[in-house]
């Protein structure tokens, strides 16, 4: 079933709506929809569509759409990820250091980058640490304040999810 354009549309819709972490899962999902695909075909499709694979933690990953295709609620996803997985934020000059739960830094940095905020020059992520380079010290201060607010919201969310 379907040509390349239809398959690409299906992949975008699947990735937008579902948590797909491996090429094998994507192959299986496309086959359920009637597409005759191989892992090699899906691998090429992923590259052509510019999909990124981000860490969700605890060994889990998810394919996400490129920046131009991020849903309008991308900031809501950043808030959710930030609230659940960020542990601390510190600032020095125009630099912020964001400490996360192990394995979550790259996913959060990816979302920050994809929002293309003018006040953020760029990010650099390790396993549990993100370096955020702000354009100015004032921008860094504003980001630190914003992130502190997200931390407060996140602690409330973590408490609600843990039932305590």
Swiss-Prot record:
Keyword list, A-Z: Amino-acid biosynthesis, Arginine biosynthesis, Cytoplasm, DNA-binding, Repressor, Transcription, Transcription regulation
Annotated source species: Thermus thermophilus (strain ATCC 27634 / DSM 579 / HB8)
Gene symbol of the encoding locus: argR
InterPro entries the UniProt entry points to: Arg_repress (IPR001669), Arg_repress_C (IPR020899), Arg_repress_C_sf (IPR036251), Arg_repress_DNA-bd (IPR020900), WH-like_DNA-bd_sf (IPR036388), WH_DNA-bd_sf (IPR036390)
MF terms in GO: arginine binding; DNA binding; DNA-binding transcription factor activity
Family: Belongs to the ArgR family.
One of the protein's GO biological processes: protein complex oligomerization
Cited function: Regulates arginine biosynthesis genes.
Compartments, record wording: Cytoplasm
The name this protein goes by in its record: Arginine repressor
Predominant place of localization: cytoplasm
Lineage: Bacteria, Thermotogati, Deinococcota, Deinococci, Thermales
Disulfide bridge partners, by residue number: none
The protein's annotated pathway: Amino-acid biosynthesis; L-arginine biosynthesis [regulation]
NCBIfam families named in the record: argR_whole (TIGR01529)
Cellular component annotations (GO), alphabetically ordered: cytoplasm
